[in-house]
């Protein structure tokens, strides 16, 4: 094998390692979605209150992303990822041993700090280690790891939780994380900090109106998504009257659809940059609006989950790609902000979903989410017209 082939092969192995890590982190962030009822039963709490663990987790990530990125900006990236995983593993062990909801929340906060650093640097690292000219495919592979968390991680976490208890799910994640850590340490090259930026980068980034608009759009649309998705498990069981097995299948279909979303992104986002994003938001809003009307027909609800899963994946990838392009001179700061604001949306959506569930009923989570998605669509239309030149391409 020549040196060029070795370099390219090594680069792809590094991207695969990061995709595997993305699978782990996204699995643990959202696996409580499939375990809300079981966790609530263990601590004698309603699911609307247990769901707030999603809000607290997400908001810790949002608050910690930028400070943690700045504190670690001079640390070699492979060493930093190893440290992140050690905290991640220890916190999962505590989750599995949690003797109260407060201890469970403490462990989740530890995981959230690890998450904050991981997602602030991972997308830019995937682009750095990818073979020349393959940056978009590297992001697509990273997205595949994220998607597989939805396809396999969350449903399997639910299956394990139902069979062996939710604590076993967290312990299993800790075990898989150990294997992933060993793979990361072996496959990643030395990665000195590069284009990480500093606090001086913030005024520069906020003077880019197209970028600021993307950030606001992310918060609005992700809030819409998680108003409904955070409580899809109790919605499926209580409103749609689906069995536990059917609910697991619903989560499986939602996650699996994300694979097709990443394929659509790879093929069409650069050819139709404005239309692609608008179509993704429109499809998301339509999915949320149809959640209640189709709940009486489980088959149609499962079909709807395919459109829903594809649309949110397309939206997330399109936003991430644009942020990286619009802030190529301060990628780590820009992605820390993106990760933080994405989690502001997750937390806001989970909180809003909790309020809606308690005051209006679980049946209303889709309609409220759809209203937010409509606001996001209008904002995206404004951005497409106002910042057409800056947003005309998503290429890296």
UniProtKB/Swiss-Prot annotation:
Gene3D superfamilies: MFS general substrate transporter like domains (1.20.1250.20). GO terms for cellular component: plasma membrane. The keyword Transmembrane applies. It is a multi-pass membrane protein. The keyword Glycoprotein does not apply. One of its GO terms (molecular function) is carbohydrate transmembrane transporter activity. It comes from the Bacteria. SUPFAM superfamilies: MFS general substrate transporter. Its main location: membrane. InterPro entries: MFS, MFS_dom, MFS_Efflux_Transporters, MFS_trans_sf, Sugar_effux_transptr_put. Keywords: Cell inner membrane, Cell membrane, Membrane, Sugar transport, Transmembrane, Transmembrane helix, Transport. It holds the Pfam family MFS_1. It is found in: Cell inner membrane. The chain crosses the membrane at residues 15-35, 50-70, 81-101, 103-123, 136-156, 170-190, 209-229, 246-266, 276-296, 298-318, 333-353, 365-385. Belongs to the major facilitator superfamily. SotB (TC 2.A.1.2) family. Involved in the efflux of sugars. The physiological role may be the reduction of the intracellular concentration of toxic sugars or sugar metabolites. HAMAP family: MFS_SotB. PANTHER family: PURINE EFFLUX PUMP PBUE, SUGAR EFFLUX TRANSPORTER. NCBIfam families: PRK03545.1. This is Probable sugar efflux transporter. It comes from Pseudomonas aeruginosa (strain UCBPP-PA14). The lineage of its organism: Bacteria, Pseudomonadati, Pseudomonadota, Gammaproteobacteria, Pseudomonadales. The gene is sotB.
């Amino acid at each position: 094998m020549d040196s060029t082939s070795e370099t390219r092969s090594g680069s792809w192995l590094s991207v695969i390692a990061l995709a595997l890590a993305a699978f782990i982190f996204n699995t643990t962030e959202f696996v409580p979605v499939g375990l809300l009822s079981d966790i609530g039963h263990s601590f004698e709490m309603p699911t609307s209150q247990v769901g707030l663990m999603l809000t607290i987790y997400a908001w810790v990530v949002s608050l910690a992303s930028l400070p943690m990125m700045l504190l670690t900006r001079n640390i070699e990236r492979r060493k930093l990822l190893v440290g992140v995983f050690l905290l991640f593993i220890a916190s999962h062990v505590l989750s599995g041993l949690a003797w109260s909801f407060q201890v469970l929340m403490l462990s989740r906060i530890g995981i959230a700090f690890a998450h904050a650093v991981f997602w602030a640097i991972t997308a830019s690292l995937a682009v750095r280690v990818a073979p020349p000219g393959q940056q978009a495919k590297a992001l697509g592979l990273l997205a595949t790891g994220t998607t597989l968390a939805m396809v396999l991680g969350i449903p399997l976490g639910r299956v394990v939780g139902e069979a062996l208890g939710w604590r076993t799910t967290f312990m299993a994640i800790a075990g898989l994380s150990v294997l992933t850590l060993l793979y990361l340490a072996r496959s990643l090259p030395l990665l000195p900090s590069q284009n990480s930026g500093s606090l001086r980068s913030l005024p520069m980034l906020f003077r880019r109106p197209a970028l600021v608009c993307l950030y606001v759009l992310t918060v609005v649309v992700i809030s819409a998504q998680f108003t409904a998705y955070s409580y899809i498990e109790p919605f499926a069981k209580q409103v749609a009257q689906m069995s536990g097995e059917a609910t697991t299948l619903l989560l499986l279909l939602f996650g699996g659809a994300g694979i097709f979303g990443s394929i659509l992104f790879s093929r069409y986002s650069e050819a139709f940059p404005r239309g692609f994003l608008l179509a993704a938001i429109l499809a998301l809003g339509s999915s949320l609006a149809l959640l209640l009307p189709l709940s009486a027909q489980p088959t149609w609800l499962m079909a709807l989950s395919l459109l829903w899963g594809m649309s949110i994946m397309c939206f997330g990838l399109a936003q991430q790609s644009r942020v990286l392009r619009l802030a190529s001179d301060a990628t780590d700061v820009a992605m820390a902000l993106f990760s933080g604001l994405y989690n502001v949306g997750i937390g806001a959506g989970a909180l809003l979903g909790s309020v809606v569930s308690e005051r209006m009923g679980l049946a209303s989570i889709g309609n409220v989410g759809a209203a937010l998605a409509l606001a996001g669509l209008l904002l995206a239309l404004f951005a497409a017209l106002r910042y057409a030149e800056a947003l005309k391409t998503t290429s890296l």
